[in-house]
């Protein structure tokens, strides 16, 4: 009997796969547990509609990530860090970068950063993971504050 899976089933297939199984297995195990449905024209139409919507959502998310990449790479973030005798007093962390980015209308999330960041003086290039293979390079500039602390 040909069926369409409603959920992932171990050793059988993934959701929306069309598989051939024995009648008893389908009728007594898969159908009662709502793991599968008989292969009908309606089931095939639902499957095709779902896969089409999933592909459209994927393309939409990919396009948004590409736009965000362009904005991130054109927008450097600049911080002022206190100093004492020319040495940095503290450091810039991921949370501060995210907050400044939000003020500049960049929607960065913590999971985009590969590691926790602690930056000192200078220009730093951070690689952000946006979407699957799409990465962006964020420029963060940390300048010493004009006054010194004692």
Curated annotation (Swiss-Prot):
One of its GO terms (biological process) is translation. Gene3D superfamilies: Ribosomal protein L9, C-terminal domain, Ribosomal protein L9, N-terminal domain. GO terms for cellular component: cytosolic large ribosomal subunit. Disulfide bonds: none annotated. Coiled coil: none annotated. PROSITE patterns: RIBOSOMAL_L9. It comes from the Bacteria. Pfam families: Ribosomal_L9_C (PF03948), Ribosomal_L9_N (PF01281). One of its GO terms (molecular function) is rRNA binding. Keywords: Ribonucleoprotein, Ribosomal protein, RNA-binding, rRNA-binding. InterPro entries: Ribosomal_bL9, Ribosomal_bL9/RNase_H1_N, Ribosomal_bL9_bac/chp, Ribosomal_bL9_C, Ribosomal_bL9_C_sf, Ribosomal_bL9_N, Ribosomal_bL9_N_sf. Belongs to the bacterial ribosomal protein bL9 family. Binds to the 23S rRNA. This is Large ribosomal subunit protein bL9. The gene is rplI.
